[in-house]
Structure formats: structure tokens, C-alpha cells
């Protein structure tokens, strides 16, 4: 997962 990526956001 790339930096700054939030799957739970």
C-alpha cells in the first residue's frame, strides 16, 4: 500500500 493510503478511512 502506498504512503498516505487509508483503506479504513
Swiss-Prot record:
Q: Which family does it belong to?
A: Belongs to the bradykinin-related peptide family.
User: Chief subcellular site?
Assistant: secreted
Q: Where in the cell is it found?
A: Secreted
Name used for this protein in its record: [Asp6]-bradykinin
Q: Name one GO cellular component term.
A: extracellular region
The record's GO molecular-function terms, alphabetically, read: toxin activity
**Taxon lineage:** Eukaryota, Metazoa, Chordata, Craniata, Vertebrata
Query: Which top-rank group of organisms is this from?
Result: Eukaryota
Q: What does this protein do?
A: Induces relaxation of arterial smooth muscle, by targeting bradykinin receptors (BDKRB).
**Keyword check for Secreted:** yes
- Which source organism? Pelophylax ridibundus (Marsh frog)
Which tissues does it occur in?
Answer: Expressed by the skin glands.
UniProt-listed GO biological process terms: defense response; vasodilation
Keywords associated with the record: Amphibian defense peptide, G-protein coupled receptor impairing toxin, Secreted, Toxin, Vasoactive, Vasodilator
